[in-house]
Amino acid sequence: MSHPTAPSASVAASNLTFRWPDGTNLFDGLSLTVPRGRTGLAGANGAGKSTLLRLFAGLLRPSGGSVTVGGNLAHLPQNITLDTALRVDAALGIDERRAALRAIESGDVREEHFETIGDDWDVEERALATLGSLGLGGVELDRTVGQLSGGETVLLRLAALLLERPDVLLLDEPTNNLDLFARRRLYDAVDSWRTGILIVVSHDRDLLERVDRIAELRSGSVSWYGGGWSAYQEALATQQEAAGRMLRAADADVRRQQRELEETRIKVARRQRHDKKLDGQRKAPRIVAGERKRSAQESGDRLRGLHEDRLDEARERREEAAEAIRRDAEIKVSLPHTAVPAGRTVLTVRDLSLPYGRLREGSLQVKGPERIALVGRNGAGKTTLLRALTGELAPSTGEATAAVPLKFLPQRLDVLDDALSVADNVARTAPGTTDNQIRSQLARFLFKGARAEQPAGTLSGGERFRAALAATMLAAPAPQLLLLDEPTNNLDLASVRQLTSALESYEGALVIASHDLPFLESVGITRWILLDDALRETDAEEVRERFGSPESTPAGTA
């Protein structure tokens, strides 16, 4: 991905303000300068990462302040759509130069052909080399986009951007919907970036390990951390440890100030009673006694006021310390009815072939609370297999039989009715469950109080996933087999952690189709199944090796 030195590469924002049409501010006075090299832009869903990239790319206009970009900029958005009838060379933006080269080679030396080519006489060789570096060496320039898989289409669009020799490259969730092979090719491209500025938004931890620094977008401001994802997490842990100490010290200070204030009140009251008693014994003149009482009252008020001020200051310091603590809520739910005895047969697949994908004859038996990762190239048929396991899709031959209640959570999250509230969506899947029981469980899925009444159609991406997960896991009868299709796609890392904590509470069998290896390893996978023309047992190490090698599966076969 390297290219000639780009001295003009620069990205900066000065006092940047951006507000949505409803008047909501996303950024208010944001200023930053992005250094050369690879920067990972991290932050929760809704923090504004994609919006910031679009502002850098000039696709959105600031409401105030300025964005300055120096050099040639290229932007890879999250959602890529290409005309399926488009030829690969046209998608790469080199079709006119190729045509001019062919014309000159055939003897047509009109000036217009030379003007089209300019100095780019090796454009075809560069295009093929770029495709090859991204694992698309088997893709011919005359093929159509419709012959490529979804992952290959993303890599093709990236190749087109690289051929522009950008000084600034913006990548927005580039590994979404990429299989492990395509991810590895993209990782290699990021590893090879040497000059200019690369900014990548991603929830892919393996990708974020490859950047030079992390820029965390949080509450409308940016904090910088040197190194990749692990270094960033270590820095956050150190910060949180220090913040925890500060909070404990602030709590202790508040308690001390409260104690001293109470002691002061007692002392002042005791002194006033004592002075009043003395005045009575001395039979002091009323005017003298009154003056002495007023003086004592003022002295006591000053002393109390001093300690009250100290207590207020201690409480303010406590609030500041508490704000520095990150509280990423976790899903902790009890699901005892999902438990499956260790020896019980949960799922049987015999000699299965599918109408779509690559599976020609696959067999599999799942017993007890096994946790199975289903891996394979894009187009291999993982989603098709999951649909066949649910009975939603009839296999071409063979059979799949579930011996326990099962639930399927698809990528599209279409288990939700957008017109219904979160609570009503769960009630649909859990007939016979009382409203109080539903709300009690939803609170554990972080939908507390009025949040459970929110219509599903108004939820953010992470909230929508939690609602769909709740409707799936809280279903009646309780699912003892759970099928998940690419569950971490489009989730921020906080939502991935919430999913992981929810699955820790699940006691049934799991089958998860995913390309997210760190996630799979975090949920305690016990078996790895590779889907190709058969269902084959494998392991995490082989999966990494297999999909890290371009020779493992030729481009264009997925």
Walk through the language-model features, giving the residues of each.
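ABC-family P-loop ATPase nucleotide-binding domains
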Residues: 2, 82-150, 412-481, 486, ...
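Coupling and communication elements adjacent to P-loop NTPase active sites across diverse families
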Residues: 1-19, 97-154, 238-356, 553-558
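ABC ATPase nucleotide-binding domain signature region
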Residues: 38-39, 51-112, 368-438, 515, ...
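Conserved beta-strand-loop-alpha-helix hinge in the C-terminal portion
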Residues: 85-86, 90, 220-245, 531-558
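Catalytic Walker B motif of ABC-type/P-loop ATPase nucleotide-binding domains
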Residues: 169-173, 178, 409, 481-486, ...
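Hydrophobic anchor residue at the start of the ABC signature
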Residues: 158, 186, 469-471, 488
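Conserved beta-strand
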Residues: 13-16, 25-37, 65, 349-367, ...
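Conserved catalytic loops of ABC-family nucleotide-binding domains
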Residues: 189-200, 502-512, 520
